Amino acid sequence: MNRIEHYHDWLRDAHAMEKQAESMLESMASRIDNYPELRARIEQHLSETKNQIVQLETILDRNDISRSVIKDSMSKMAALGQSIGGIFPSDEIVKGSISGYVFEQFEIACYTSLLAAAKNAGDTASIPTIEAILNEEKQMADWLIQNIPQTTEKFLIRSETDGVEAKK
């Protein structure tokens, strides 16, 4: 594979990653009942993610990258997302926040590499879009890490209160 083929492959992977993120965020947002700040931020990032998918599809189209291969990449990313997400136990909200942060860091690393590949492949038209997506992922990761302590504290208080659901 040459540098352009690698770049195109990684663009397909980024698209698949965002499709998986969309599913994970939709699932998480639908289960959150008692943590309105977290739910609102996840819903905001879900909206960003849907926009990122459209932006990545524009890049794929501009580079004449076939969408038929995307299905294979999507199944790889689905497996990764499920392994990161897992099935949440009684402390679902805390583990979900941690898993979300880990996934955001994975996305940050992927987009950092994709940005370098875009520059190396000479796809200057896509650089601002990739930089913008990278920035959104960093903002979400920052928000999660800053709010994990408060989510954990709220969970601990709720878990010790009789008749109050804490996990979600």
Swiss-Prot record:
SUPFAM superfamilies listed in its UniProt record:
Ferritin-like (SSF47240)
The protein's superkingdom reads Bacteria
A Pfam family the protein falls into? DUF892
Family matches, as InterPro entries: DUF892_YciF-like (IPR010287), Ferritin-like (IPR012347), Ferritin-like_SF (IPR009078)
Q: Please state what the protein is called.
A: Protein YciE
* Gene coding for it: yciE
